């Protein structure tokens, strides 16, 4: 009762109150790969400052949890560990960060298992990552790589670019991934396989718009009862969008989701895709108070009023960390 009496009363009349957005598929690299033949490695301090600025931008646009994947350049590189160290140095301020290592593939071949095992040992020892992303097309049920991941107690995510649905089913059975990064042009058979699995399918609405992809598989997967999530697909070298409000709008206008489905896909479903849904992604008792106050009368206006940052206030762990509204604490 004492805590309730001491709490600040924040007026939100005429606003939308919702959980913070969760973006599970942001990709970062230590290399400036504009020159594909001779990518240049960034200075660690420069990368750190750029990443902090990016996380602040996410906060200002309503993304309170970001899944960061270390993206290799020209296959497997030791720079991934250095990148994840810098992200661990940033920690969970200004936003929550779930770090993942994306294993690089060279010509469709897996990097040396010894190098992978050494990297996994380092990641686990220093708590630099909790997830590892694999290419589903390169996976076998008897893979020594899966044994390594199991021993390292790492969650698995798959990268699937569409092919034989039987191959997808085998990969899902072998790896039991938390999530699968997919294109939006999946076949109906692939949608059925994903719908029957316990994995969350993650789609990039922004990329589908640029590539003029049909995007009908999201609706098909949702109708089949599958779990789907949305990501901005941010990549510093190719896709610079990190605004999840924009992603929700595109999912409704281009990918045939309802507003409710798009919001669920960018909050609670995305949180479960990164195995943090028990703490984040919805406004429930015993969950962390990660809350957005949007300057909208109705949540259904979000896709209709495209191009405006509607975030008026951000609350993290019960504390106001961003206030763009007219209300001030002294006015309480």
Predicted regions and their residues:
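His/Asp/Glu-enriched, well-ordered alpha-helical/loop segment
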Residues: 153, 218-296
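Metal-coordinating catalytic core of metallo-dependent amide/deamination hydrolases
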Residues: 38-52, 56, 66-169, 174
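Histidine/acidic-residue-rich catalytic or RNA/ligand-binding cores of hydrolases
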Residues: 77, 110, 140-144, 164-174, ...
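C-terminal cap of metal-dependent C-N hydrolases
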Residues: 268, 285-332
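Glycine-enriched alpha-helix->loop->beta-strand junction motifs that scaffold or abut catalytic
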Residues: 128-129, 148-155, 172-179, 193-202, ...
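Divalent metal-coordination and catalytic microenvironments
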Residues: 14, 25, 62, 69, ...
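Catalytic beta/alpha-barrel core
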Residues: 131-138, 155-162, 177-188, 202-210
């Amino acid at each position: 009762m004492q805590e309730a009496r001491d709490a600040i009363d924040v007026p939100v009349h005429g606003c939308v109150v919702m959980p913070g957005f969760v973006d599970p598929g942001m990709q970062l690299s230590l290399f400036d790969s504009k020159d594909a033949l001779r990518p240049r490695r960034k200075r660690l301090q420069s990368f750190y400052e750029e990443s902090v600025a990016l996380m602040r931008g996410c906060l200002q646009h309503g993304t309170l949890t970001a899944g960061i994947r270390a993206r290799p350049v020209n296959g497997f590189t030791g720079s991934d560990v250095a990148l994840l160290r810098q992200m661990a140095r940033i920690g969970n301020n200004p936003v929550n960060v779930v770090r993942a290592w994306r294993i690089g593939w060279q010509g469709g071949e897996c990097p040396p298992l010894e190098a992978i095992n050494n990297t996994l040992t380092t990641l686990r020892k220093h708590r630099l990552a909790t997830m590892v992303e694999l290419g589903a097309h390169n996976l076998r049920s008897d893979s020594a790589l899966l044994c390594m991941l199991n021993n390292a107690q790492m969650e698995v995510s798959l990268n699937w670019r569409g092919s034989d649905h039987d191959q997808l089913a085998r990969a899902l059975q072998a790896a039991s991934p938390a999530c699968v990064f997919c294109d939006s042009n999946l076949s109906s058979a692939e949608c059925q396989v994903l719908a029957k699995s316990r994995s969350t399918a993650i789609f990039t609405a922004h990329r589908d718009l640029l590539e003029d992809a049909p995007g009908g598989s999201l609706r098909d997967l949702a109708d089949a009862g599958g779990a789907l999530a949305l990501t901005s697909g941010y990549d510093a070298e190719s896709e610079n969008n990190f605004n999840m409000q924009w992603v929700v709008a595109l999912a409704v206008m281009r990918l045939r989701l309802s507003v409710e489905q798009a919001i669920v896909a960018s909050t609670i479903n995305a949180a479960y895709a990164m195995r943090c849904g028990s703490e984040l992604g919805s406004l429930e008792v015993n969950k962390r108070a990660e809350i957005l106050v949007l300057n909208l009368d109705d949540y259904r206006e979000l896709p209709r009023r495209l191009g405006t940052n509607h975030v008026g206030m951000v609350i993290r762990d019960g504390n106001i960390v961003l206030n763009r509204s007219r209300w001030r604490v002294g006015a309480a």
